[in-house]
Amino acid sequence: MEMKKIACGVLFAAASMTAVMAAEEVGAPAPGPASAASAALPALGSLVGASLVSLFSYYLH
């Protein structure tokens, strides 16, 4: 069971690093948001990220 937790942690870390390394850099700045609806998008992303981390920690516990 302990090896399963370690393997899951390593796999999660590798997937996170792969996602970060795959991000392409954009030379030109992005245009500003056209409406206030896009302002809530970062809050939604952090909520999803917190939920995934919570689920991952619950799985390892």
From Swiss-Prot:
The UniProt record lists the keyword Glycoprotein: yes
PANTHER family noted in UniProt: ARABINOGALACTAN PROTEIN 23, POLLEN-SPECIFIC ARABINOGALACTA PROTEIN BAN102
Residue ranges of coiled coil: none
Function: Proteoglycan that seems to be implicated in diverse developmental roles such as differentiation, cell-cell recognition, embryogenesis and programmed cell death.
Protein name: Arabinogalactan protein 23
Gene Ontology cellular-component annotations: plasma membrane; side of membrane
Presence of keyword Signal: yes
Family of this protein: Belongs to the AG-peptide AGP family.
Membrane topology per record: Lipid-anchor; GPI-anchor
Signal peptide segment: 1-22
